[in-house]
Amino acid sequence: MKWIEKIFDKQNIFLFLLIVMVIFGKLIPYREAYNSYFNLESFIDWGIAGIFLLYGLKLNIREVVRDISNWKLHLLVQLGTFVLFPLLVFLFYGVAKGTPYFITWLSIFFLASLPSTVSSSVVMVSIARGNITSAIFNASISGLIGIVMTPLLMSFFMKQGSADAASHAEVVRQLLLKVLLPIVLGLLLNPVFKNFVNRYSRWIGEFDRIIILLIVYESFSKAFTENVFSSVSPFVFIIIAVSCVALFFIVYHILKWICGRLHFNREDTITTTFCGSKKSLVHGSLFIMVLGIPEEQKVLYLLPVMIYHSFQLFYVSWLANRIAREAT
């Protein structure tokens, strides 16, 4: 019966639904004409703001402050997330620049620029019996740092010629209205709605997933109706898939080696490697909508994020259970 439970695990169901949304985008694509009945794009915009509002409401400031003393672990995780990842991809910038594969490289760099995922990092660390408090701290703080770092890192390589001052101002406005303002509002309302959020945390988590599924559906609908995938050859898909898997293993083992050099204990090593090697599908999906990425390229940016997210869930789930068994 355990194999049945694994198949119907919440994360596996979500991955299955992601695939379903891609299929729906092909078979029943959402078209602009449907906006007169239901404006999906506006609903997603409000949903993005809602996710970050809830993120602010769920953030436990006391937990964050209490665990700040474990600074070596926190620094290593954030350096892995926002320095090591982008640096590894940047090594291939010279190869991709000026070629038809530059957008492919940029989509992988976008993945590398994202913050760590929140929920699955904490869950996997818990399964492997790592330092859960530090996992919560890093998962939370990574999302906040990502609000600044992801747009900053991407700004160095996104086309400047096609974006005038007005479009740059619009990107900043979108980030402020859809990301920063909701988080600040959530933090201010945290003391009032803390108990409510804790009580209904399971249902609140489902809201995140619904918005992500809708973003995937809308993006792939546009991609299929505008024939975007004609530009994604099997060779490009293989490059993206291999790059995602290689990135994970390189970062994971570099962080594990550094943990050994710093004499981290078992629990801190688990937390560092698990949190530092993860990338957030939530933030990836949301940043695609607010960074001024052209409509016809959104799917190309989303593809590496979805591949990496799927791989990290399946592999790290297996790895966490193996580490837990070895500890007993």
Model-derived features with residue positions:
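Structural signature of multi-pass alpha-helical membrane transport proteins
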Residues: 1-97, 155, 159-266, 327-328
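Helix-loop junctions at the membrane interface of multi-pass solute transporters
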Residues: 66-67, 119-131, 231, 256-260, ...
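The feature identifies polytopic integral membrane transport proteins across all domains of life
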Residues: 71-78, 99-112, 130-140, 262-277, ...
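Membrane-embedded alpha-helical segments of transport systems
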Residues: 80-88, 113-118, 135-156, 176-180, ...
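Hydrophobic alpha-helical transmembrane segments of integral membrane proteins
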Residues: 92-99, 286-292
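Membrane-interface helix-loop-helix junctions at boundaries between adjacent transmembrane segments
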Residues: 93-149, 154, 158-171
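Extracellular/periplasmic helix-loop-helix junctions in multi-pass membrane proteins
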Residues: 227-234, 288-306
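Membrane-helix cytosolic exit motif
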Residues: 250-259, 302-328
